[in-house]
C-alpha cells in the first residue's frame, strides 16, 4: 500500500501530470512523469497515481492490477525526487502480466525518462 502522503488524490494533479508530463509507453503500462520545479509541499515527497480503466477487465481484475502496480510503485518511491508526480496507466495486457514484469516495465520507463522532465 502506498503511504497517504505519496498518493495522488486530486483530479487536477492527474490532469496536470498527464497533460504536461513526459510520456513513456511499454507493452502493459503507460507512464507519465512530471517533475515540478516548485512543488506545493516539498516534505510530502513524490506522488503516484494509478489509472486502471474498464478495458483492463472486470472489477476484480482491475483491482488486482491496481494492487500490483501500487506494490511496484511503493518499491520505487526512494528513486523518485520529492517533486515528482507519476501517473501509471494500466493497459489491457497488464491483466495477465506478473508483478515482476510490471516492475521491470516501470523501471525501464523511469530510466528512459529525460532528466529535466516537466515544464
Swiss-Prot record:
Q: What is its EC number?
A: 3.1.26.5
Q: Which GO terms describe its biological process?
A: tRNA 5'-leader removal
Q: Which InterPro entries match?
A: Ribosomal_Su5_D2-typ_SF, Ribsml_uS5_D2-typ_fold_subgr, RNase_P, RNase_P_CS
Say which enzyme class the record assigns: hydrolase
Q: Which UniProt keywords apply?
A: Endonuclease, Hydrolase, Nuclease, RNA-binding, tRNA processing
- An example Gene Ontology CC term for this record: ribonuclease P complex
Instruction: State the Gene Ontology terms under molecular function.
Output: 3'-tRNA processing endoribonuclease activity; ribonuclease P activity; tRNA binding
Q: Does the keyword Transport apply?
A: no
Answer yes or no on keyword Cell membrane: no
Gene3D superfamilies named among the record's database cross-references: 3.30.230.10
Q: Which reaction does it catalyse?
A: Endonucleolytic cleavage of RNA, removing 5'-extranucleotides from tRNA precursor
Family membership noted in the UniProt record: Belongs to the RnpA family.
Q: How does it assemble?
A: Consists of a catalytic RNA component (M1 or rnpB) and a protein subunit.
- HAMAP family attached to this UniProt entry: RNase_P (MF_00227)
Query: What does the function comment of this entry state?
Result: RNaseP catalyzes the removal of the 5'-leader sequence from pre-tRNA to produce the mature 5'-terminus. It can also cleave other RNA substrates such as 4.5S RNA. The protein component plays an auxiliary but essential role in vivo by binding to the 5'-leader sequence and broadening the substrate specificity of the ribozyme.
Name this polypeptide is given: Ribonuclease P protein component
Annotated organism of origin? Mycobacterium avium (strain 104)
Give the classification, highest ranks.
Answer: Bacteria, Bacillati, Actinomycetota, Actinomycetes, Mycobacteriales
Q: Which gene encodes it?
A: rnpA
